[in-house]
Amino acid sequence: MKKLVLIGLAFLITTSLSILYGQKTVVRYAPDDDGTVYTSVEAALKAGKAVYRLKLAKLANRDSLPEELFQLTELRELTVKGCRLCRLNQNIGKLTKLQYLNLDHNKLLRLPESIGRLSDLRTLVISRNILEELPESIGSLRQLATIDAWGNPLYVLPHSIGELRKTLRVLDLRQIPLTKWEYEAMEQLLPETDILFTDICECENRRDHD
């Protein structure tokens, strides 16, 4: 298995991850897809046609997604970044055509089990939240190729993640306080996955003194 030990190589990390899921190439999902990225739920609902991309930069006076969003069942890409989101609605499971879900830089404490219904999901970005664990249902995401989870206080990963061994190509666990033993366990579960991690002994020492 290929494994990257990344300590302070910010330029290398930025380059590799931008290739993986920061690319500018626009994927056309249907003949009527003109590449439009909507930036508010209100505008998307007024579009009068299928909406494939929604990118939210703020949620006014909210800590969860508006229920109206889940009417957009044709969504393929959903980005909710830096919105101070504290809770992800169970109704996220209704967006079954999602291929890309970016929840970077929020305040999520957990992900709902219903996320396992996103059977077409390819990329899951959950970096820079407050997640301590991932739901067992993540093992149901059999199309998932990339999980970006860096910067979370994850103390445990579900054993079901091993169900992704045939599709998962990148698992970003940088700045996560897992022990060396736990990383080795991930290698056994996901032998074909590139696991990105920070080889910093303080992470293990912190666990030993808890």
Residue spans of the language-model regions?
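The feature encodes a structural signal of leucine-rich repeats
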Residues: 42, 65-67, 88-91, 111-114, ...
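LRR N-terminal entry segment and analogous cap-like coil->beta motifs
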Residues: 31-34, 42-90, 95-100
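Conserved hydrophobic beta-strand positions in leucine-rich repeat
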Residues: 52-57, 78-80, 99-103, 121-126, ...
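Sec-dependent signal peptide cleavage junction
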Residues: 19-45, 200-210
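Bacterial Sec-dependent N-terminal signal peptides
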Residues: 1-27
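Leucine-rich solenoid repeat scaffolds
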Residues: 155-210
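Leucine-rich repeat
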Residues: 48, 70-74, 93-97, 116-121, ...
